[in-house]
Swiss-Prot record:
Keyword set includes Protein biosynthesis: yes
Gene behind the chain: prfA
Protein name as annotated: Peptide chain release factor 1
Family: Belongs to the prokaryotic/mitochondrial release factor family.
Gene3D superfamilies, sorted: 3.30.160.20, 3.30.70.1660, 6.10.140.1950
Pfam families membership: PCRF, RF-1
A GO CC annotation given for this chain: cytoplasm
Organism in which the protein naturally occurs: Pseudomonas syringae pv. syringae (strain B728a)
PROSITE patterns listed in its UniProt record: RF_PROK_I
Length: 360
């Protein structure tokens, strides 16, 4: 293991001792804010320190076994050879575990997201494919016990969506979906195609973490234009009688968000403001993320919206993710919500990139 990583582990061990003492301090116990903060840090550090202690014990066992290799008794030497082999394997596994635990955590991984799907090139076929993608993510959300709430939708003339925006709420939503941003391409024969020719169309997907109150960008009300209109979305006859839908334009950036799915104008405004904050946050962080990805020549994790990330080929039943050269012949299962088959290899590749950079 690299010396820089061992230094980090020594620092964490010292910090763990400090935290143990602090959590037993009467002054800290009486201050609930400090006590909760230290408790959270303790919970994060404790498993790493415990595993590091195990690593040090196994290193000691290895040194003892290696000393026995010089023993005059051939039986002892034979036993020591086997013990050295097993202990070295243990060390490899423990080091790999510790490296994964030391990877920098994305503070957004546990957040809910705003999922934006827009039809691109391909006209009606692109809109139909937007609908396919939205159903795919909705089914995936069902499998994971997440809740999907449509905020805004613009349906296509022959099905699907020209644009659909949803909020996805649940456990580690952003951590799972963050690499879905980009251009998704579909190749298939449209139902209206009499010659059986394959058409290519595309949609763009954007996954934005929902900011919390501390993370939310401060927005000057003077920079906003707020319009109300009658919703064409869910809610039945009630929404047709009131201007409950909200459209907010952020004048300095030109970003427009709208929410029409709630009956309450107040709720629609709150959702729209949260989405606007997410888009402004994304605007700030995307440039930095792209610069880092470019510098390290990363494909996974760049989040470039214009990057073609995946192709769905219906005649071949094939899904190809171009970032990790992954090809699966299980298109129906993926579209039915089995997106983990694509997501997990992407997360593994990203983790490998992080491990390569760790300790540099």
């Amino acid at each position: 293991m690299k010396a820089s990583l061992l230094n980090k582990l020594d620092v964490l061990s010292d910090r763990f001792e400090e935290l143990t003492a602090l959590l037993g301090d009467a002054e800290v116990i009486s201050d609930q804010t400090r006590f909760r903060a230290y408790s959270r840090e303790y919970a994060e550090v404790e498993p790493v320190v415990a595993l590091y202690a195990q690593l040090l014990r196994v290193q000691g066992d290895l040194e003892g076994a290696q000393a026995l290799l010089k023993d005059s008794d051939p039986d002892m030497r034979e036993m020591a050879v086997e013990e050295v082999r097993e202990t070295k394997q243990q060390l490899v596994e423990l080091e790999a575990q510790l490296q994964r635990m030391l990877l920098p955590k994305d503070p957004n991984d546990g957040r809910n997201v705003f999922l934006e799907i827009r039809a691109g090139t391909g006209g009606d076929e692109a809109a139909i494919f937007s609908g396919d993608l939205f159903r795919m993510y909705s089914r995936y959300a069902e499998r994971r016990g997440w809740r999907v709430e449509i905020l805004s939708e613009n349906e296509g003339e022959h099905g699907g969506y020209k644009e659909v925006i949803a909020r996805v709420e649940g456990d580690s939503v952003y951590g799972k979906l963050k690499f879905e941003s980009g251009a998704h391409r579909v190749q298939r024969v449209p139902e209206t195609e009499s010659q059986g020719r394959i058409h290519t169309s595309a949609c763009t997907v954007a996954v934005l973490p929902e900011p919390d109150e501390q993370q939310a960008i401060e927005i000057n009300p003077a920079d906003l234009r707020v319009d109300t209109y009658r919703s064409s979305g869910a809610g039945g006859q009630h929404v047709n009688k009131t201007d409950s839908a909200i459209r907010i334009t952020h004048l300095p950036s030109g970003i427009v968000v709208e929410c029409q799915e709630e009956r309450s104008q107040h709720k629609n405004r709150a959702r729209a403001m949260s989405w606007l904050s997410a888009k402004l946050n994304d605007q700030q962080t995307s440039a930095a993320a792209n610069a880092i990805a470019s510098e390290r020549k990363l494909l996974v994790g760049s989040g470039d919206r214009s990057e073609r990330i995946r192709t769905y080929n219906f005649p071949q039943g094939r899904v190809t993710d171009h970032r990790v050269n992954l090809t699966l012949y299980s298109l129906d299962e993926v579209l039915a919500g089995g997106v983990d088959a694509v997501i997990e290899p992407l997360l593994a590749e990203y983790q490998a990139d992080q491990l390569a950079a760790l300790g540099e």
